[in-house]
Amino acid sequence: MWTAWCVAALSVAAVCGIRQDTTTVLRVTKDVLGDAISGTIQKSDAFRSALREVPVGVGGVPYNDFHVREPPPKYTNGRQLGGNYKYGHIEANDNTAQLGGKYRYGEILDSDGSLRDLRHEDYRPSDSAYHRGPGRYRSAADPSSAGRLHRRELRPGEIPAGVATGALGPGGLLGTGGILANEGILAGQGGLLGGGGLLGDGGLLGGGGVLGVLGEGGILSTVQGITGLRIVELTLPRVSVRLLPGVGVYLSLYTRVAINGKSLIGFLDIAVEVNITAKVRLTMDRTGYPRLVIERCDTLLGGIKVKLLRGLLPNLVDNLVNRVLANVLPDLLCPIVDVVLGLVNDQLGLVDSLVPLGILGSVQYTFSSLPLVTGEFLELDLNTLVGEAGGDLIDYPLGRPAMLPRPQMPELPPMGDNTNSQLAISANFLSSVLTMLQKQGALDIDITDGMFEDLPPLTTSTLGALIPKVFQQYPESRPLTIRIQVPNPPTVTLQKDKALVKVFATSEVVVSQPNDVETTICLIDVDTDLLASFSVEGDKLMIDAKLDKTSLNLRTSNVGNFDVFILEMLVEKIFDLAFMPAMNAILGSGVPLPKILNIDFSNADIDVLEDLLVLST
């Protein structure tokens, strides 16, 4: 019931954006977060899972762009026979006219503006184009038009128009944009011999071509040039963290990777240094838990060493390996970082666990707001829920009017230069713990004669020596019972170097009659001031209280009025030697501290400040 209530309350507050009360604040530096990530990596199998075959050969989709995978485009950017082209066509769409303007495969521009299909020897005037079958002639200006001018006989010395205006003219065989001229099929950009053409730089047979195996951009320097990659060793990474104010963290993991593989020129042993970098945002999910989420992940390669077991050209292989690994390692290593951060997120979620508070209650820490990231520390605001064993929630301060606001969490002091973590516990939280003990009756105690050796005999004779009327009513010595009860919740006040606990108690003096009938002699109100000291054992805050002073007030008496001051020394001794040991025994179970990021507070420096108890490591 208690767990269900906490989860429900937390979920409602988180979804509705309600800021819960903060009773505990944890600050950690980047070193603590880095140690938590390193410890998670060492304890998990996340990095060992990378010892497997590396998937290559599909060109690789960047880890950060995995969501934009698309089918292959209809138009490619290969330049085997020109610029952009349709499969089965030679078509220039970028003003690089290999055979003139736009044309189909096998066509050439004639002097009259029509296109000749060179795949067929017979050609006839355009007026009969429609009778020659499809695809023989068409107009360059109008693809739907098939007409050509009728050819006439040439006079002696006359240059044919097809040569003057075609072969030598613009768009002709040798003219600007022609088949052999600049920008033509042989020399133009994207042409047969031009840049990106069949034989040109980057072309089919040129430098970087598919058959230029040893050239830059050849098959050896493509993903297909290396196969069978397998990661055989991955060292535990060296983790470094940089805080990004208002965002999260910048994570860097430096590791060494050993890879085996094969290339066209031999077997490979590859050793590479990898720096995995990730921008991580600190968010809060709908259930109120903080989450570290990768926004971008990259791998930076350095110090690549390639050993060829059989083969030549190591420099060429170095370049190939560098490109291949830069393409595939992000897909392999970045998901591992995501898994590691998921495990760290699980550690953050452990703070929400329900922890027993002795046998009488439990404590649960919940996140009250989105964590704060500054350039110096990460701050986590926690709300502490204290519950009774029966399931009721302790809502401190009890007994106060509901309209009175709770005291706000004070500002934390600056972190010291050598401080990595700082846990601030409010006086409200400590009061809630004592309130739970009070409601369970754990602070109530009955003290009888002989229970504590250091106390004087608790009899009517001892009391009668101080109050004569007691001796008169009970001339025969009878045993007494001192019944101490704490009807109201104690309060904790924290001041500079001083922790004060105020406990209001009632002390009822009861005499036991021979027939087991109990008679009350008097009822005294006792206001006590206790001085508290703190220590840490394991993952618990230990509280030890010491009696400082008492103040008595006689509420009722069955032996007449008397000056209660005469009982002050006796009552103070009873509280010091009986009540305080019993209370400290209850407090001895300790107060559970938040379990988060594997922080060890056992050797923490403890400072008592105004309304704050601060543990620093």
From Swiss-Prot:
Region named Disordered: 124-149
Record-linked Gene3D superfamilies: Bactericidal permeability-increasing protein, domain 1, Bactericidal permeability-increasing protein, domain 2
Keyword Signal: yes
Tissue/organ expression: Highly expressed in olfactory mucosa but undetectable in thymus, kidney, lung, brain, spleen and liver.
Keywords, in A-Z order: Cytoplasm, Disulfide bond, Glycoprotein, Secreted, Signal
Parts of the chain that traverse the membrane: none
Localization terms from the record: Secreted; Cytoplasm
Tree of life domain: Eukaryota
Disulphide-bonded residues: C297-C334
Keyword Ligase appears in the UniProt entry: no
UniProt-annotated glycosylation sites, renumbered to this chain: N275
GO molecular function per UniProt: lipid binding
Main location: secreted
Signal sequence interval, chain numbering: 1-17
GO cellular component: cytoplasm; extracellular region
Family: Belongs to the BPI/LBP/Plunc superfamily. BPI/LBP family.
Function: May have the capacity to recognize and bind specific classes of odorants. May act as a carrier molecule, transporting odorants across the mucus layer to access receptor sites. May serve as a primary defense mechanism by recognizing and removing potentially harmful odorants or pathogenic microorganisms from the mucosa or clearing excess odorant from mucus to enable new odorant stimuli to be received.
Name under which the protein is recorded: BPI fold-containing family B member 4
Gene behind the chain: Bpifb4
